[in-house]
Amino acid sequence: MTERIGGCNYMKRYGHLYEKIYDMENLKLAHQHAKKGKGWYAEVQMIDSDPDKYLKELQDMLINKTYHTSEYEVFYKNEHGKTRKIYKLPYFPDRVAQWAILQVIEPYLIKHLISDTFSAIPDRGIHKGLSRVKKAVQHDVPNCQYCLKIDARHYYQSVNHDILKQKYRKMFKDNDLLWILDEIIDSINTAEDEDLVSIYLLDEDIDPNTGIPIGNYLSQYSGNYYFSDFDHWMKEVKHVKYYFRYMDDIVILARTKEELHQLLKEINEYFHNNMKLEIKKNYQVFPTYIRGIDYLGYRVFVSYVLLRKQTCKDMKKKMVFFASSFCRKLQNIFVGCCNYIL
């Protein structure tokens, strides 16, 4: 049975999932997934030395509800001219625990997501999103004359904990599952003072329980799911045919710019009233037939697609780095061989 709220259909609420999370086979699989590419981590090697012992320890934490999110390590990463604050949890027990949770709840989250959202979803991603945008632009030219591009200001830092927890409660009725989701969501507030002031109007109480950590595995799915009601509102209430979302990066196509400007006003209201988000001031409304759509690292035109300049530059930098690294390794091997021969 489905529940209809705000013009959008919601699937039935699911229960009896928590015991699947702490099932030993699920924990073993979580460890296998979490350790991919991290075999050199001391924590991974520690668990591999006696997996039954350590995974039983995690299982007991989950059964007895003594699990608490560990302290985050914070570091900064520069990407495309932006400095991002990254939050990192210990491999054990936290990252294994988050994998165990997501292996169980991921299918239910994906069921509620529309087909035109592409971030943090298996078998979708950038190329699937690009293909959908390209198909719209090239096969329905009259209804794709104009594009609205928006994204949320400081998105991860602006996610409201209470709203996110209520969204999970619309889907799950398992109190034990909701307990551990709440525990992870409330483990840290990542919003800066300027984010809080920007989000909340003067006549509202500022909620300090805001912001989820970039770098948390659960944050990717929570960040995607936070938008799900909005996605359904766009499709089922506003009946927007060409709406595409990659996390908080949104592209909407329409016949006229007037339609898009009106829609932008309504989106602004929805963001503030229902999600406590703010649209970045650099939103764009433009004709697609003149400049193409800059999205997901590409520029999409009616008759062709180009790589974005910055994407090309990034690829060149990586190629130079790997080439120089490979040359250094060859040189070291050559010197080693010469020393051995001599």
Feature roles, as predicted:
Residues 1-56:
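Non-catalytic, polymerase-adjacent accessory regions of viral genome-replication enzymes
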Residues 3-4, 13-17, 102-160:
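Active-site-proximal segment of RNA-dependent polymerases
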Residues 268-277:
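A common structural junction motif
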Residues 61-62, 136-247, 251-266, 287:
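Conserved polymerase palm-domain catalytic core
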